[in-house]
Amino acid sequence: MHDLPLRYFHSVAKTGSLSAAAEELHVAVSAVSRQISNLEDTLGLQLFERKPRGMQLTEPGELLLAYATRNVLEVKNVIAEMRGVNTLQQHKIALACPEGMAWEFLPRVTAEFRNFHPGASFDMQVVDSARASQLVKDGAVDIALTFSLTPTMGVEIALSCESPISALMPASHPLATRESLTVQDLREYPLALSQPGSTIRYLFDIACNLHGINVVPTYTSQSLGAIYTIVRYSRDVIALCGTATVSGATGRDNLVLIPMSDPQLRQRSLQVQIMAGRKLPVLQRYFLSFLEEQLLTVSKPAATRG
C-alpha cells in the first residue's frame, strides 16, 4: 500500500474531518478527499461513514487505522535510527496508567531505571484503565498499565498479574494481626474508599451486596494519596488497595496490608499492555523488561507473559 494515501487516511482518522486533516497536512481539502476516495476504490471497501459532524471510521477503517498507526510509528523509528538518535542515551518513553500505579510504584520504577539508563526520559499520563488501553492502542503511548476485570481487546498483553485487593491499616489496628479479612470484618471500623467508578469500589460494592450488608464509608476520595494519608494518620481507619500500589510505602509508614478473602475482591488483574503488532524501540523494550521484573516481585506468583 502506497505511503501517501495511508498518511492521508491516518490524518483523517485521527482528526475526524477532511478539513482538519487538510490543515494538518498543508494541502487542499479536495486533495484529501480524492486520496480517501481512491483508497476506498482500490480496496473495494468503505473506510469512513460521511456524517454531518465529520468522518467516522467503519469496521474495515478501524482495522486499517491500526495498521496505519503501526506504520507511522515504524517510519519514525527508522528515521530516528538513520539519524543516529535512536540510542540508549536519547529516547522518551511514553506511559499511561491509573492513579493506583502512578502514586508510588511507577515513579519508583522509572527512577530506578534511570539509574541504569540516565539518558532516558519519561512522559506519564495518569488516566483511567480504559483510557490507558485506548492510548496504547492508538500509539499515543508506548506502554500502558491497567487494572482489568475482563479480557482487553485490541492490544498485546505483555504481562498479566493477579492483583487482588487488600485492606490497608495501621500496624496497631485491632485487625492488623489477622491472616485475611472479609467485607463483614470491616463493618465495625471507619473506611476510606475510592469513589464509585474505580475497580476497587466496584468489586467492594458487589461483595457487600452479596453479603447483604450496607457499608457507608467515613471517607471517599478520587485521590489515592489522600486515602493513604488518612490511613497513615489515623488509628482505626481502613482503606482498600492493591499490593503493587503501596508496596514501597507501607513499611516506612508503619502500615500493614491484610489480604481480603472475598472471591469478588480477588478477580482483578494488572496488565502491562503494548500496541498489538508493534515493535518497540530498543530503550522501550529494555524498560518493558525492567517493568515486568519489578511487577513480578510485588505481584502474585500466577503471572503470565505475553
What are these regions (language model features)?
Residues 10-28:
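Short helix-boundary/capping micro-motifs
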Residues 40-57, 62:
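A short LG(V/I)-centered, amphipathic sequence patch enriched
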Residues 42-43, 64-86:
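Alpha-helical linker/hinge and terminal dimerization helices associated
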Residues 87, 155-165, 169-191:
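Flexible hinge/capping segments at coil-to-helix
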Residues 90-152, 221:
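Central regulatory/effector-binding core of bacterial HTH transcription factors
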Residues 105, 256-301:
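A late-sequence structural motif
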Residues 153-159, 163, 225-276:
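Beta-alpha-beta core module
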Residues 190-211, 242, 280-289, 298-301:
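Secondary-structure junction motif
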